[in-house]
Amino acid sequence: MLQLSISHIIVLSLLIRIGFFLFGLYQDKYMTVKYTDIDYVVFSDAANYVYNGYSPYSRETYRYTPLLAWMLIPNCWGGQWSNFGKYIFMISDLITGIIILKLLSGISIAGKKLSTNKIIMLSSIWLLNPMVITISTRGSSESVLTVMIMLSLYYLINKKSIIASGFWLGLSIHFKIYPVIYLPSIMLYLSTSGTPFIDVPIVRWVNRTNIKFLITTLITIGAFNGIMYSIYGYEFLYNSYLYHLIRIDHRHNFSVYNVALYYKSALSEIAEASLGFFTGNMEKFVMLPQLSISALILPLLFARRDLISCIFIQTFAFVTFNKVITSQYFIWFLIFLPHYLAQSKLYSNKHMMKGIVALLLWIVSQGSWLYFAYQLEFLGISTFDNGLLFSSFFFYISNCWILSVFIDDLNNDL
């Protein structure tokens, strides 16, 4: 029987990514529906503006840090250089998988390290996952972000380097703001790593170690944001951060708020004002339960018990309650799933069926939404009132139940 090693799985994952990339070139050239993500076109256009001495925000719908456009300047050099960004994203995707392998190799359960077979099986959730591979080879930049986040955890857990970990988390928050929800978790995790300044309830969680981490993270965020603001001014702040607080995106959106925001986007200012303060500002208020659960309650419950598993559940909750959800967002929590399953009872024979039901429910609820979205986008059939509305609720309720399973599992209540 063929025995795979960790080196084999890395080489295999690289070859599969190359295969997907080459197929994408063929599909873009010969098929009606293109393989390359529209976001990659936006990134490339923004890079072209930078290359010619203009702001990346001259490209409408570019809502990212200028760093991304700077990274993709070689896209403008013509020929195969137009795929430079995809090479970066594929390499970042692979590096993320390698860091996952390293973190798994450091796990001990009852004093025993994970077996090589288990490490390979768990890391395959990322390295051999067709959804992960498709997203990076189509030209999504999420893998650049996942490298930063995983480097932060690697330096924190494996290397015990507070400054390096804080730097990478700060850079990831600059790159895309949502990783800020990990800051409370890491602060709580580090609360046991030093002598508290004052030994009184709650305040005793603050010590030299987590203050050092916090300061490093904030300095990194401030430095990168300060540089970008000095170059691009308010348009950087608005497009990179403020826009996402008021964003309304009714296409390709699994969110339970999808249909409501779609109809709201069609209202005149007068009609919108008549909705009342809360309903008229729905896109702002939906963040309250989302952040309360993902950035406050879950860290308080689980951060000191198992940091990466806590971050996994945080991210799953954040995506579930987000006002915009696309398939790319699933990448945000998939990077932590191998670590979570390594110590989860859902991976055991006794509870595996519950895990399988959760997986099937997650897939089926997505499939039902995609079916009605396909009818709307490609067949021109209006499915907003019935199909998309109910399938969005189905997806939301399914995710809430799955979240409760994860919480019970980590809380030893299965």
Swiss-Prot record:
Pathway info: Glycolipid biosynthesis; glycosylphosphatidylinositol-anchor biosynthesis
Q: Where in the cell is it found?
A: Endoplasmic reticulum membrane
Record's bilayer topology term = Multi-pass membrane protein
Q: Where is this chain primarily localised?
A: endoplasmic reticulum
Q: Which residues cross the membrane?
A: 6-26, 87-107, 119-139, 149-171, 183-203, 213-233, 282-302, 316-336, 356-376, 387-407
Q: Which InterPro entries match?
A: PIG-M
* One Gene Ontology molecular-function label: alpha-1,4-mannosyltransferase activity
Q: What's this protein's family per the entry?
A: Belongs to the PIGM family.
Name the chain's protein. Answer: GPI mannosyltransferase 1
Ranked from the top, the taxonomy reads: Eukaryota, Fungi, Dikarya, Ascomycota, Saccharomycotina
